[in-house]
C-alpha cells in the first residue's frame, strides 16, 4: 500500500506453487529451505542394474551398463505423435508438452527407463536437480537427455485418467561436443566412458506416497531440440545426409562409474 498507516498487505517474500501437492506455499526465501530449521540435502539418486533407481550406490557384481541404439532417422519425439497445433490456442498441444504423459517415450527401445520402488512416504525436492551421467557413444558426437519423472499409481481414485501417468518434473539436454567447452566444441572418442554433469530446471515438487520416481535417458528430443548427426561436424546446421548415423549409447552404473541424478531433497520441515 502507498498510503501511510494502511494495514500490511501480508504478502510473503516468496510465493511458490508446489507441484505434487498442488498447493501454493508462502516462503521467507528461495531456495525453499534457506530459512532456519529447514535443510536441503543434495542426495544422489542412482541409476542401477535392472533399470532400477535408488539411493543406494551400485555394488560390485551388478551389470555395469545399459545400452540402446540411437538413430537420427527415427528420433524420440518430445510429445506423442501426431503433433498438432503450434500456436497458443486452447486446442493446441504446444502449451501442454511439459506435463505430457511420458509413457510414449518409456515404451521405446531407444529410451532407458529407470524406476524406483513405490514410495512409502513423501519425497520433496526444492531446487535444481543435477544429472551426473557416465556414458559412451560409438559415434563422435552425442546428445544426452535426462528426465526426472513422477509415476502415478496404476489407480488414482476419482481421476482414472491419471492411472500410471508419467509426469515430467524436470528435464534437459546436453550436447556432448560441449562437454569441455562451449566456446570450443570437440569430438568425442568412440567407446570412451565420459562424465556429463548438467543441471535440470528448478523444481518444487513432492512425490507422494504410492508414487514412484523415474529417470529416463535418451539421445534425441525432436523437434524440441535439433537432431544430432552423431558424427562430429564443425556445424550441425551444415551436416550432410551421410553424417547422420546410428550410434550405440551406453549408460554406466557400476562402482567408480556411477550415473545418478542429484536431488535437492528437503530433509526437514
Locations of regions flagged by a protein language model:
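C-terminal, loop-rich substrate-recognition/catalytic regions characterized by aromatic stacking residues
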Residues: 1-269
Amino acid at each position: 500500500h502507498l498510503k501511510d498507516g494502511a494495514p500490511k498487505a501480508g504478502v510473503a517474500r516468496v510465493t511458490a506453487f508446489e507441484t505434487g501437492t498442488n498447493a501454493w506455499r508462502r516462503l521467507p526465501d528461495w531456495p525453499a529451505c534457506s530459512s532456519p530449521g529447514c535443510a536441503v540435502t543434495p542426495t544422489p539418486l542412482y541409476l542401477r542394474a535392472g533399470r532400477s533407481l535408488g539411493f543406494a550406490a551400485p555394488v560390485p557384481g551388478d551389470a555395469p551398463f545399459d545400452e540402446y541404439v540411437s538413430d537420427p532417422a527415427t528420433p524420440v519425439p518430445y510429445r506423442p505423435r501426431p503433433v498438432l497445433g503450434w500456436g497458443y490456442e486452447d486446442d493446441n498441444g504446444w502449451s501442454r508438452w511439459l506435463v505430457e504423459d511420458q509413457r510414449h517415450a518409456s515404451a521405446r527401445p531407444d529410451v532407458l527407463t529407470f524406476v524406483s520402488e513405490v514410495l512409502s512416504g513423501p519425497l520433496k525436492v526444492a531446487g535444481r536437480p543435477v544429472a551426473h551421467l557416465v556414458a559412451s557413444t560409438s559415434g563422435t558426437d552425442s546428445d544426452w537427455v535426462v528426465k526426472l519423472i513422477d509415476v502415478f499409481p496404476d489407480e488414482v481414485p476419482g481421476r482414472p485418467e491419471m492411472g500410471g501417468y508419467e509426469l515430467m518434473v524436470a528435464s534437459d539436454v546436453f550436447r556432448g561436443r560441449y562437454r569441455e567447452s562451449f566456446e570450443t566444441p570437440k569430438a568425442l572418442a568412440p567407446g570412451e566412458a565420459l562424465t556429463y554433469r548438467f543441471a535440470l530446471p528448478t523444481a518444487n515438487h513432492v512425490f507422494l506416497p504410492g508414487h514412484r520416481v523415474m529417470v529416463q535417458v535418451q539421445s534425441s528430443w525432436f523437434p524440441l531440440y535439433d537432431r544430432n548427426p552423431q558424427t562430429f561436424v564443425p556445424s550441425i546446421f551444415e551436416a550432410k545426409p551421410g553424417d547422420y548415423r546410428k550410434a550405440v549409447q551406453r549408460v554406466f552404473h557400476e562402482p567408480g562409474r556411477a550415473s545418478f541424478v542429484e536431488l535437492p531433497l528437503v530433509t526437514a520441515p
